[in-house]
């Protein structure tokens, strides 16, 4: 007895009919069966077309327009008449819309009114006055500014006139500060009252880019300290001694032969002095007499000079230095 076993298998449902159909078509082409009627049923073809079409996702509107009701629009018009463009106050008046929504609605409403202004008749609709735009707020401090510095003391009129003539900038420093900074230019001497300064003629000197007032005194200053006078005389005596020593060591007559002036310091001092003409002229007469006595031949140039001639030259140089010191004392300027 033969037992026959029949295995029944269910047909597999393919999830991708398009792929299966393409495989069948390719197998038919390979076998040579190009007939369109073979293996194609009208029922299966319609089912295949339906599966091919993809379903689009529904379009979700993320931002919906806020619709204004008639009541809200009427409140909006009332608030515009009351508050103009005060959006916060209009928001409180309406109660259901935000300030941003009210401002956008007003912009659309105003543009619509401007377009319909020509076609609209005056009697049909009441004219709504569009409020003018609010002025922009100016910043209280747009950029930092320097506060004006109050001047403690006004500059004298003579200084301003001289600065206009010289085209130099005015100094912001006070008079006391300038005195402290320029102490090295002034000598340690007691100053007189302001009345004496005003009576004396004043001249200006530009010193390191600053204008300095100098009071010229016609008469010799009477008030000097004894210590200052002693220091000045000591310095002058030391300077005169150094000058005589250099003249003796180098030889004045040799320099006269070469054409250089050994008494250059004496001549510079004599050029600067104007008031003491008589003593300087007498001293120069003595020097000229000494020059006439000496000759420029090499015999006189070499060797030492007589003792009497050296003494006379020392007297001349000492007298010149004393005259120069007296003139310096008389021409001392007051710098303020």
From Swiss-Prot:
<keyword id="KW-0805">Transcription regulation</keyword>
<keyword id="KW-0804">Transcription</keyword>
<feature type="compositionally biased region" description="Pro residues">
    <location>
        <begin position="145"/>
        <end position="158"/>
    </location>
</feature>
<feature type="DNA-binding region" description="H-T-H motif">
    <location>
        <begin position="87"/>
        <end position="110"/>
    </location>
</feature>
<dbReference type="Pfam" id="PF00249">
    <property type="entry name" value="Myb_DNA-binding"/>
</dbReference>
<dbReference type="InterPro" id="IPR001005">
    <property type="entry name" value="SANT/Myb"/>
</dbReference>
<feature type="compositionally biased region" description="Polar residues">
    <location>
        <begin position="167"/>
        <end position="189"/>
    </location>
</feature>
<feature type="domain" description="HTH myb-type">
    <location>
        <begin position="60"/>
        <end position="114"/>
    </location>
</feature>
<dbReference type="InterPro" id="IPR009057">
    <property type="entry name" value="Homeodomain-like_sf"/>
</dbReference>
<comment type="function">
    <text>Probable transcription factor.</text>
</comment>
<protein>
    <recommendedName>
        <fullName>Protein REVEILLE 7-like</fullName>
    </recommendedName>
</protein>
<keyword id="KW-0539">Nucleus</keyword>
<dbReference type="InterPro" id="IPR017884">
    <property type="entry name" value="SANT_dom"/>
</dbReference>
<feature type="region of interest" description="Disordered">
    <location>
        <begin position="114"/>
        <end position="197"/>
    </location>
</feature>
<dbReference type="InterPro" id="IPR006447">
    <property type="entry name" value="Myb_dom_plants"/>
</dbReference>
<dbReference type="GO" id="GO:0006355">
    <property type="term" value="P:regulation of DNA-templated transcription"/>
</dbReference>
<feature type="compositionally biased region" description="Basic residues">
    <location>
        <begin position="134"/>
        <end position="144"/>
    </location>
</feature>
<dbReference type="GO" id="GO:0005634">
    <property type="term" value="C:nucleus"/>
</dbReference>
<dbReference type="GO" id="GO:0003677">
    <property type="term" value="F:DNA binding"/>
</dbReference>
<dbReference type="InterPro" id="IPR017930">
    <property type="entry name" value="Myb_dom"/>
</dbReference>
<keyword id="KW-0238">DNA-binding</keyword>
